[in-house]
Amino acid sequence: MFQDNPLLAQLKQQLHSQTPRAEGVVKATEKGFGFLEVDAQKSYFIPPPQMKKVMHGDRIIAVIHSEKERESAEPEELVEPFLTRFVGKVQGKNDRLAIVPDHPLLKDAIPCRAARGLNHEFKEGDWAVAEMRRHPLKGDRSFYAELTQYITFGDDHFVPWWVTLARHNLEKEAPDGVATEMLDEGLVRKDLTALDFVTIDSASTEDMDDALFAKALPDDKLQLIVAIADPTAWIAEGSKLDKAAKIRAFTNYLPGFNIPMLPRELSDDLCSLRANEVRPVLACRMTLSADGTIEDNIEFFAATIESKAKLVYDQVSDWLENTGDWQPESEAIAEQVRLLAQICQRRGEWRHNHALVFKDRPDYRFILGEKGEVLDIVAEPRRIANRIVEEAMIAANICAARVLRDKLGFGIYNVHMGFDPANADALAALLKTHGLHVDAEEVLTLDGFCKLRRELDAQPTGFLDSRIRRFQSFAEISTEPGPHFGLGLEAYATWTSPIRKYGDMINHRLLKAVIKGETATRPQDEITVQMAERRRLNRMAERDVGDWLYARFLKDKAGTDTRFAAEIVDISRGGMRVRLVDNGAIAFIPAPFLHAVRDELVCSQENGTVQIKGETVYKVTDVIDVTIAEVRMETRSIIARPVA
């Protein structure tokens, strides 16, 4: 009799609309209960039975119940699931399979089965890609997943690489395809094979994409020709190889190996500027005045060159610093190295005075054995030879940015707008508390930004610099010319790595149109979105593989007295993140390791400090000694403890 009662339906509707609800993200804990985080200030308790309906990270709408002054959340509706496609480890075998997601806060096994057409018999320990098919908040009885891809077996030494690439849905190998002959581009190539071009790279580099030639001119001027490998001489726009490169957008450099953007035949051979091999190039000739200014007579042209020597960073640096036993093979090569060092000196000074120079940070290199085991991790400081190449590339990219801007009005530009205007007042207020006075309007201009950066670089520590990083905007890829505040430049467009960056290939095609005096089509904005997304995924993949290898490397140091110098990189409510100076590993120091009495301890992310009893004991950028307390292999996390 109540079935179609309109009054009852109305009452139900009323009760539903009057019941308080909240939307937020589920945060799981190790203890079985969880929280619904609505915003930074507000969260609701989710009891263990209700947590069975949801997963950490799910965005949900929940009914809020109040009992005896205590509020709790009952999940009602799924807004966005945390898990859709994921990687994990298979449990069980044959017809009763489950998968445990590879995530620090997801511990429960999810029942699953292999997708139709997936011809692999899964067994305990296998790694797989899965997709969620059922969720309790969608009216299903339980969670359920489908295995869509077999990654590898549990004991594979190369699990860190294969699992990471599968997680981010990135390619595992070089693209297929061959380039049989050069295209007829209607370009006249200058024959520069007689000039003493050299390449400077790591000893193991195969994909050499830049060669340099320097010459002294009257009036204390120097000429530099930067010759860049020319893959667009082989790859037609819109061809199969071009489309594959467009999707990959970059060569993916992971510890131990890379996955190239172009077929290896091109990247490591046909396009690589190998010593004593004739190669087509796109070149830029520039004149530098005595103070390092790039004069206006910039010239881009197509050419053929023959590199006369493959030089190695450390050997060149040693020779210029009068150490080591390496010698250039001829006086002509020695003269090139001396002139290039002079150019580097001039350009470095010019950028220091008129733009911005990044602080040198070492690169960390993993030395791996046959089975992917980490034999060592070495810090490679940036030396004079690295800076020679860096200054030449930056100068060449400044030239391209100018030419594309003035001749076409578009290109693929790296743009960085400095500080977000919305943060300008907060930034000025923060700096004022540290005795630095800046004008909130001026700091949004390129000159104002550079002025502030120079003042920060002159500070005795990097503490203040670390405090203002959160006010900065992110660098972007744009088809419009625009300033790059981070480099202190009016415009910056890269074209010097076309073997490994698709954006540089686009700029090559545009520069060739300028050389031929032809009109060119503006690149579509979608390509910049794809490039930015791929750059983000590649960086995450590099970090994930690195975390895995660091955990492997430091595992036997856990619980020992081995000390490591560590720089504090971040402070949060839960503790501090530090970077080990010798090898670059990131470790976490939980708050209880800093001080036993929680009420006397204040860890402030806002101030970048740790205070004990009101006294600042640690701050971001401090270097402290730590030992490794624990390495958790399943989450690839390293827990450290300060040395008392």
From Swiss-Prot:
It catalyses: Exonucleolytic cleavage in the 3'- to 5'-direction to yield nucleoside 5'-phosphates. It is found in: Cytoplasm. GO terms for molecular function: exoribonuclease II activity; RNA binding. SMART domains: CSP, RNB. Residues 561-643 form the S1 motif domain. Its EC number is 3.1.13.1. Keywords: Cytoplasm, Exonuclease, Hydrolase, Nuclease, RNA-binding. Residues 189-516 form the RNB domain. SUPFAM superfamilies: Nucleic acid-binding proteins. InterPro entries: CSD, NA-bd_OB-fold, RNase_B_OB_dom, RNase_II, RNase_II/R, RNase_II/R_CS, RNase_II/RNase_R, RNR_Ribonuclease. One of its GO terms (biological process) is mRNA catabolic process. One of its GO terms (cellular component) is cytosol. Involved in mRNA degradation. Hydrolyzes single-stranded polyribonucleotides processively in the 3' to 5' direction. Belongs to the RNR ribonuclease family. RNase II subfamily. PANTHER family: EXORIBONUCLEASE 2 (PTHR23355:SF37), RIBONUCLEASE (PTHR23355). This is Exoribonuclease 2. It comes from Escherichia coli O157:H7. The lineage of its organism: Bacteria, Pseudomonadati, Pseudomonadota, Gammaproteobacteria, Enterobacterales.
